């Protein structure tokens, strides 16, 4: 099958989730692991069937795995994507729109795709506190997301100034991702965190 690598990654994520969830450093009940999907994968019914089958077999609780839709190329079949997102959510996956604000992503996509999480691209975070349009765009996304009961992840937070500005938004639905908190790490490094605290 064309998407065997991604399906293997989903299996691996399911196994890793079960192990990492037991670590002492993971105290949040909202803990989940994300992986990226391409537009081609989200538009492929056979791939969606297999992904749902893997999650069902795993017996994991709902929302323990998040599929991030990476929109690097234009959407070919919006109706099929909307339908497949609905199927994935009903099966228990979280859905995120990754790198929002780049390439083809736009407000129309936000309205039509029933994502749980909007991940705002690092390009917007880089301009925080310096560029009016970037600040106002993020504030707008936060307001809309709050009304729609969606979470927002601001990507690429790399310093205290950016972090302080984001904290100043005083929004309960905003989360951050970036080197200011941690670089990406493997399972063994996550495991080591439980002994360092």
Q: What is the role of each PLM region?
A:
Residues 2-80, 156:
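Catalytic core of bacterial c-di-GMP phosphodiesterases, primarily the EAL and HD-GYP domains
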Residues 22-23, 38-43, 64-76, 93-197:
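EAL-family c-di-GMP phosphodiesterase catalytic domain
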Residues 49-53, 80-83, 132-139:
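Charged helix-capping and loop-helix junction motifs
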């Amino acid at each position: 099958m064309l998407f065997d690598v991604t399906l293997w990654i989903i299996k691996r994520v399911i196994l890793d989730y079960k192990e990492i969830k037991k670590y002492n450093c993971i105290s949040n009940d909202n803990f989940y692991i994300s992986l990226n999907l391409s537009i081609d994968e989200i538009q492929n019914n056979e791939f969606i069937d297999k992904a749902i089958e893997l999650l069902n077999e795993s017996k994991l609780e709902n929302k323990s795995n998040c599929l991030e839709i990476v929109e690097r190329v234009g959407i070919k079949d919006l109706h099929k994507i909307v339908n497949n997102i609905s199927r994935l959510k009903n099966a228990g996956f979280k859905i995120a729109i990754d790198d929002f604000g780049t390439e083809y992503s736009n407000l129309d996509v936000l309205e039509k795709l029933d994502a749980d999480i909007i991940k705002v691209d690092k390009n917007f975070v880089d301009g925080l506190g310096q560029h009016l349009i970037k600040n106002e765009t993020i504030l707008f996304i936060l307001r809309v997301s709050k009304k729609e009961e969606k979470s927002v992840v601001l990507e690429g937070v790399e310093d205290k100034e950016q972090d302080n500005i984001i904290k100043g938004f005083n929004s309960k639905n905003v989360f951050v991702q970036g080197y200011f908190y941690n670089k990406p790490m493997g399972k063994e490094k996550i495991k080591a965190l439980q002994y360092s605290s």
